[in-house]
Amino acid sequence: MSVRREIHEYDGIYFVTITCSQWFHLFELSNGYDEVYKWFDHLKSKGHFITGYVIMPNHIHVLIAFRNTQGVSINSIIGEGKRFMSYGIVRRLKEKNEVEVLARLSALVNATDRKRGKRHEVFEPSFVPMAIGRKECKSNKFINQKLNYIHANPCRGAWDLVTEEIEYTYSSAKYYETGEGIYVITKYTELEDIDLTKAL
């Protein structure tokens, strides 16, 4: 059974995992990596910071430093992001004529959501503790542990997508190592002088 934990704080650094429904390789199938970066851009526009990430073929790990959300729950922000990315991924799947995949995603929508107009279940609806759904990062040591975990993902186990962490395109590993990468992030050490409790 999946478990959802409500977050009652409105700022801080969080480790977030978002998983595609039934672990389908939807980012890869749709070439939807850009949809994640669009969401990251949206978060930045609201004053939040992307501190580390990896986009795997079927899931995302990301460290997000939330600046004071002014009463908007972090759960809601993550939920909005999932909806935003879902629309983009479904659009891309339609463009690629992935009829079978779309049918499988449609079959996963429960009756209640279907009545509300939902047509595809792109992401797992809840956060599973064993997947480390989200945990608040309270120290640099903990953040480092999570960054190491994030950056090692493409080299780990059955994935074996690259030999070296910095070789994986859709990750902040290269940015931490060289200061360059496909997407600009804010290193966690740069956050030390930023008061996340203050709104933008």
Model segments located where?
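Short catalytic/metal-binding and nucleic-acid-binding patches
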Residues: M1-L200
